[in-house]
Amino acid sequence: ITSISQSSSYGGQVAKYGGFATLEHILYFDATESASGTELWAYSPLNGTYWMTEEIRPGSAGSKPGSSTGLIPMSGKLWFNAEDGTTGSELWSYDPTSGTAEIVADLYPGSSGSSPGVFSGLVPISDRWLLFDADDGSFGIEPWVHDTLTGQTSLLGDINPGNSPSLPGYLLPYKDVGNHIVFDASNQTYGTELWAIDKTSQNWEATMVCDIWQGSSSGQPNSGSDDPLVIGDRIYFSARDQAYGNELWSFNSVEQTCTRESDIRPGSQGSNPGSVSEGFHNIAGMIAFSANDGTTGN
């Protein structure tokens, strides 16, 4: 469509960090050229024009928009992480109406940056909330939410107390399931297990909903598959326990219970469901996935 950089050194460096996103018929992407480095650009297919939306980080270093979050369109704005050279990597937004970009929250004061979305990405929920992981320098890497309606950014819990990280959403990214937002997180007491936020609660706070492998060992929800599956008020995912190994599990948002749905491979080795089928797939109301029963292979 166009050549943004006139230098062969930067050729092909389009959508390298944040990918592509569309908002109100405009295509947004990160692009690199020698004078401003990597910044947020836009292209209009209506008139064939392209432009740099804003130079968030002045100079040739570039802000690398979307490097950990991607570019997320929601509520009439574009949301992403960026580095302005002063605050480090933080959450930003771009408003196409005003044509300006602004920092949403400086969660880690100073130049270090909170590095939002490194493990979970930036996940839009119900066209209002943005869920992500971040490190504010006090609590370690924990779950955060930004409410695009109120403009508030809040910590959802110190799951792993102190400055140790809980790595929320690392295995099972934030998923909207009924009245809950479900994800995995880790602490020293329970290991890596399934956690949730009740969207109907006045004050959102993360709580553990299932200790699949009881004690400090980890159930590792969704560790063996690429993508869990949400059907109605349930989410299906792989998880392991001491007796059955890695098998198919579900969480019921209404009853707030976890259930092992199968023992495909008897014994503690497990069938590793979804490991080679890119997770679980809804086909006419049935869940299709790969598994190894120990006899026929995957």
Report each predicted region and the residues it spans.
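Feature 14080 marks short, conserved micro-sites in well-ordered regions
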Residues: 1-298
